[in-house]
Amino acid sequence: ALKTGYNFGITVEAFHHTYVVEKASLPPGEYTNINGNIGLSWGLIAAAKKANLDLFYGSYPITPASDILHELSKHKNFNVITFQAEDEIAAAAASVGASFTGKLAVTGTSGPGLALKSETISLALSAELPLVIVNVQRGGPSTGLPTKPEQSDLMFALYGRHGESPLPVIAAKSPSHAFYAAYEASRIALKYMTPVILLSDNYVATGSEPWNLPKIEELNNLDTNIITKLNTEDGFLPFLRNVDTFARPWALPGTPGLEYRVGGLEKEEGTGNVSYDAANHQYMTDMRAWKVSNIANDIDKLEIYGDESADTLVLGWGSTYGGITQAVNRLNEKGVKVASAHFVHINPFPDNTLEVISKFKKIIIPELNTGQLLKLVREAFLVDARGINKVSGEPFTAQELTDKIEEKINE
């Protein structure tokens, strides 16, 4: 039927003008068409396999994240365990429990669900257990626009927990990149024993593109902190940290000699005993922050795209990647000097971010919110960045960004 319709379309003389889309120029390889939710799901499966762990996904159905649950439920042959909970809190709590037992634990949701999960995320952070939290953003607040894209949960991802509770935040920038973003979120969670928030949005989740399938052997193996023996001569210290990553050991229930208590109460460094000591709480608060900031040394550098001799840099994150890249291409072709850089890691920022930003006189930040990354960049790097903001439930078009960036350059 598809071929018949195609043949009819190219032969019928019903139109005054026709336009044939040229075949895409793609590197050689095996391709499949993929959307962001499927790419993200496959990235989680690949991460579990490369870490030699079972994957646990606890979720409550919510648009536009539900398809992750649907996709993962098809892959029990890869030891994927899917759990549809009675509510968002139960889904997150079950995932924390799965992490405690040695699973690559993931919970997924959209904005309203992220708010409900916040206390349980704090528990994972306090217990220092690996957990990936997927937030497929949509229009808000409240029920908002469930089927429309928005990037308005960035500040909540960074700060939406009680107490001093920093955690890594990364963002997928395209449907195919969602695979690698999920893999990276899993790597960080497992290596550093921390919850990680992975941001997607409806545009990435339901958008589609051809994807060159990677070979599983090309993906790096993922390290874990699983321990099977005593880590001191005198016994087991559940919060004796790795000197490089500051991660604590991951002792699984049932391992002889490695019994310990864990929960939401503050713990004593080393022993993990409940502690109300003032100096210890200060140290543990600082240590949890150091652990996250230290990740900046273990992530990709921020790369410049376009004319590096330009005075203007367009900074973006998440699903604005395609529109920004196309707009920069069009402006460069017109002779307008402009470059771009795109954040995947937002907390912490790549360690060369200041170096990149300092090369340019003008910083422009397009976002599908009212300027959340803009505020972060201004605060962190003391630059007078300017925003291009849109909260209409629609993505930026390439032409829209081309026009608005050129206007900002000429101001």
Give the ranges of each region predicted by the language model.
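Flexible loop/turn segments at secondary-structure boundaries
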Residues: 64-68, 90-93, 114-117, 139-143, ...
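Flexible, low-complexity linker and terminal segments
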Residues: 12-29, 33-43, 47-51, 186-411
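Broad hydrophobic/π-residue packing in well-ordered secondary structure
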Residues: 8, 60, 71, 100, ...
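Active-site/ligand-binding-proximal alpha/beta "capping" segment
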Residues: 164-187
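Thiamine diphosphate
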Residues: 1-160, 165-167, 171-172, 385-387, ...
